Amino acid sequence: ERHLQRFKYSGRWGLQPAHDRLRGEIEAELDAPLPPGVLELDSALEIPAYFASVDIHQHPGGIWSDAIAGYVYERGARSTTPLMQQHKDLHWKFTALVNERRRGSRILDMGCGFGKSTRPFWSENRDAQVTGVDIAAPCLRLAAQDAAAAQARNVRFLQRDCRKTGLPDASHDVVTSTMVIHEMPPPAIRETFAEAMRVLEPGGLMIHLDFIPPEDPFMRFMHFGHGRRNNEPYMEPMVRMDVKKTMRELGFRNVETIDFEEMPGALAARGERWRFPWTVVVGEK
């Protein structure tokens, strides 16, 4: 698994060399003019040491250090779960679940990356104002271009740290993330939850989609092994921390974790294939 991922990105015919040959065209595409207010970058933003110290997913140089990194990362993500492409995308399924619980009017997507998790929110909630924040400028540039190409008028992307977004107190009614908190060490997760509490209005909803394997030795062996092979060093510490206890300590109410069915039959008692242990983490202010 580790070597396959490395070759996928860095091999002779890997994603990085292939896109390096198209660098000029890609950079021109990412530099295309945008409507006012869609993208706000901060060149002075300090990249957290926990994030800069490891090439997450073995992405060469990380997804923040190269102008075309977001473009390459988006292409790489397409091959992560190919068997799921015959079903409704899990991001759209997750958005539907969030909307069932709370159809927000001011939605914050933390760690939005290249915008795949954000798109269903601004697409399905046309009357809402959606904000995506991330520390990786290359990803945000792609997210903004995709939104502009779709003529979206209710979304903006900001280069901010999830732990310190700089957004006003009580300014959102839904705060969400998808596959983000397992990329953070426990202290950063706690800070991110605290920031969500700060920017949520009273009664607001915090809801994250991530991975929490069941209390089964083999399942945890498989999950933690994947994390080690794929340069995801915080996957195991995140699982071992008491996420629900942390949320309650920060003041969240009605805290729960829910198994998430990413495609039909995924939660069957005897599945045919190993799967990521998709879990929804929920709390209210």
PLM feature segments, named:
Residues I207-L267:
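C-terminal alpha-helical "lid/dimerization" subdomain adjacent to the S-adenosyl-L-methionine
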Residues V72, Q85-R103:
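Conserved alpha-helix/loop element of class I SAM-dependent methyltransferases that forms part
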Residues R190-P202:
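A short glycine-rich, Lys/Arg-flanked "PGG" loop and its adjoining helix->strand segment in the class I
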Residues R163-V175:
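A short acidic, Gly/Pro-enriched loop at the edge of an enzyme's catalytic core
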Residues G113:
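Conserved glycine-rich SAM-binding loop
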Residues L108, K116-K164:
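Class I SAM-dependent methyltransferase SAM/SAH-binding core
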Residues E1-W64:
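N-terminal auxiliary segments of SAM/dcSAM-dependent transferases
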Residues S65-D66, A77-K93:
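Conserved SAM-binding loop and adjacent beta-strand
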